Amino acid sequence: MINRSAGKDRDRSRSGDKELRINHKIKAREVRVIFDDGTQSVLPIEDAMRCARDAELDLVEVSPNVLPPVCKIIDYGKYKFHQGKRQKEQRKNQKIIKLKEVRMQPKIDTHDLDFKYRNILGFLKEGNKVKVTIRFRGRELAHTHLGYGILEGILERIGDANYILESPAKMEGKTMFLVIAPKSKK
């Protein structure tokens, strides 16, 4: 027989969704209890459980790594709901910046270069970083100045204050690249 539950527990711990200990699952003998009105006191676990039971709420261990562990007397279902709502709001407000790559060769035609330039501008307007890469093959490596010229031309055409050069043009093996990023709106 295969034990399938071990994998599920491992996946849950990896996702960062740690379960808080509540009521009888709290293992400490003594806890610091924060009441609804904000007052604190250090109580034996039995007294803290009794206070929670009298208020018809749950005793939730919110900070287990301190001595004594910090517990709150709250409605656990309501607490989980608000935690989920807060995390959803944080994910919604988070902006993911992607790195887009535009590749070309040193012997690129002007029309093709114009097309690549429009792609670069489009990526920057979307808020993404752009890595402009020029690949050299064979004897083209003897003419790296052509690559620098192309990259300089792109930077001159962009020349807008809304974009910054994050990484200047440099050679790495047979490729030359630079990274352009949009300025952050603060």
Swiss-Prot record:
Keyword set, alphabetical order: Cytoplasm, Initiation factor, Protein biosynthesis
UniProt-listed SUPFAM superfamilies: Translation initiation factor IF3, C-terminal domain, Translation initiation factor IF3, N-terminal domain
Compartment(s): Cytoplasm
Renumbered residue ranges of the record's region Disordered: 1-20
Listed GO biological process terms: ribosome disassembly
Disulfide-bond pairs as recorded: none
Gene Ontology CC: cytosol; membrane
Stored NCBIfam families: infC
Function: IF-3 binds to the 30S ribosomal subunit and shifts the equilibrium between 70S ribosomes and their 50S and 30S subunits in favor of the free subunits, thus enhancing the availability of 30S subunits on which protein synthesis initiation begins.
Record text on subunit structure and interactions: Monomer.
UniProt record similarity statement: Belongs to the IF-3 family.
Listed PANTHER family: TRANSLATION INITIATION FACTOR IF-3 (PTHR10938), TRANSLATION INITIATION FACTOR IF-3, MITOCHONDRIAL (PTHR10938:SF0)
Designated name of the protein: Translation initiation factor IF-3
